[in-house]
Regions:
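Polytopic membrane enzymes that build or remodel cell-surface glycoconjugates and lipids
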Residues: 2-480
């Protein structure tokens, strides 16, 4: 235990390596190919077009360009970098917890380990398009540390960088004042003034680049703060982080998981209530809600599947701090047992997640490779089914046309259905001249109207099944 307290970074790094390094050979997926196509054709010239992004996050995209240049578009080395970022963020959480939030060493170390292992982080680590969430959280935590060290220039620099990595960075001043209250530090009003000026200047530059203040998915999505929506999403994230229902294979296991978590958290909560520390509970809840507000109107499919886990990357910080505090509050022998069980369970769940990412990568690689082999001189090709996701992990919701463009294949592609693959050898079967779905769910249709007009103008109809493409005769093509 003494060794753990003296060298926490070593222990945290070993857990991070064991959890993620074996899976770093995951390739590029979905939206990655869109960015890669523009990078291949324009390189750093993408800056003049705001990187073809509806959001204004230039710092993230500049970091992406640097990584693509330095590592020559090697996905393995890029994911190694993302794993290192994840480790560094965990170390920052440890430092802030022990130096500024008055956590005991055991609580601080445990919080950092939980951040590494909580089984919702894989999307932010293994999807190149999600690296902005890592960059923003890292820069936000560095800005918070600068605030506590009273380094105003450093704070301003990292605050500016964080809000231009991801819009959630705008919440940084709220975090520092909330943490100041928790640490009983005197608030530094000069920081509030500088933060206000930075936000104003950032919004002006944002408007000049995007032509609007909101951007992204638009005002209807981002500014729709209906009370019912807010309560529903916050409730959804509570279910996600406090039940781990996604990993329960039966209702009995789900009940067991919930009872276990309640039994761990109850002594700590009762202690706070007994000592009338309602302000700390309220503060924790406030920080958790602030972490969710920037993504409040975005999908929360991550309760049941991996998809959209990146939206909870920020919110996982107050969660792991709370878990770390609760576990360390238990009596010594019970604490050690609960720590061992928690770390083992989180590690196992994370490995299960990462294996799905490996599957998605294999599916994307095979699909694109086989498609490239099939296409020769066709002008128009109709694709029956494109893998949208594999067990929740994005595969090729976007990117098919971008990949072919990168390979200088000029065939015009029509896509009928994007589908969820539940197993790698899923796809479509074509029996008795009828198209039937096989081990797959339709996600959405792109060309549902005048379908046969599209088909009649195509040179080739292809469907994907069991890792191979099959051709369909246009004259015999019917839909079940």
């Amino acid at each position: 235990m003494d060794y753990l307290k003296r060298y926490p970074q070593i222990f945290i790094s070993l857990i991070c390596i064991a959890s993620y390094l074996p899976f770093a050979n995951i390739g590029f997926l979905s939206d990655d190919f869109t960015f890669l196509r523009h990078y291949q054709s324009e390189g750093w010239g993408m800056i003049s077009s705001n990187f073809y992004d509806a959001f204004f996050i230039p710092v993230t995209h500049i970091i992406q360009l640097i990584l693509l240049d330095v590592f020559n578009q090697n996905a393995f080395l890029i994911h190694i970098t993302q794993i290192i970022l994840h480790f560094y963020i965990a170390v920052l959480i440890y430092r802030i917890a022990i130096e500024n939030l008055n956590f005991k060493p055991y609580s601080a170390i445990l919080s950092s380990i939980f951040f590494i292992l909580i089984p919702y982080q894989s999307e932010a680590i293994f999807w190149f398009s999600s690296i902005g969430y890592q960059c923003c959280l890292m820069l936000t935590l560095v800005a918070i540390r600068s605030y506590f060290k009273d380094q105003i220039l450093s704070y301003c620099l990292f605050f500016i960088l964080s809000i231009h990595s991801k819009e959630i960075g705008y919440t940084t001043p709220i975090f520092i004042y909330a943490f100041s209250y928790f640490a009983k530090e005197k608030k530094k009003n000069l920081y509030l003034l500088y933060s206000f000026l930075i936000v104003i200047l950032s919004l002006i530059s944002r408007y000049l680049v995007l032509g609007e203040l909101v951007g992204g998915y638009g005002e209807i999505t981002h500014l729709n703060f209906q009370l019912t929506s807010i309560l529903k999403v916050i409730g959804g994230y509570f279910i996600k982080f406090f039940s781990f229902s996604r990993y329960a294979t039966s209702s009995g296991l789900l009940i067991t998981q919930c009872l276990l978590i309640i039994s761990i958290l109850t002594p700590f909560i009762l202690h706070l209530i007994k000592n009338r520390k309602f302000n700390k509970m309220g503060l924790w809840l406030f920080i958790f809600c602030i972490c969710i507000l920037p993504v409040i109107n975005l999908e929360i499919t991550s309760i049941n599947m991996i998809q959209s886990d990146r939206y909870g990357y920020f919110a996982s910080v107050p969660i792991v701090l709370f878990f770390g505090s609760a576990v360390s509050f238990l009596k010594n022998k019970i604490k050690i047992i609960v720590t061992a069980i928690s770390i083992s369970m989180f590690f196992f769940m994370t490995i299960l997640n990462n294996q799905k990412w490996i599957g998605a990568s294999l599916l994307a690689e095979n699909y694109l490779s086989e498609l490239s082999k099939v296409l020769s001189h066709e002008k128009k090709v109709f694709l029956i089914n494109v893998p949208d996701n594999f067990k929740g992990v994005y595969v090729l919701r976007n990117g098919v046309r971008d990949y072919l463009s990168m390979k200088n294949i000029e065939t015009e592609i029509y896509i009928w259905k994007f589908q969820t693959f539940k197993q790698l050898n899923g796809g479509i079967q074509f029996r008795d001249k009828t198209l039937k779905e096989y081990n797959t769910d339709t996600y959405f249709e792109k060309y549902s109207s005048n379908l046969y007009d599209f088909i009649s103008n195509c040179d080739l109809i292809l469907y994907y099944n069991n890792f191979t493409f099959n051709k369909i005769d246009k004259l015999s093509f019917t839909i079940n």
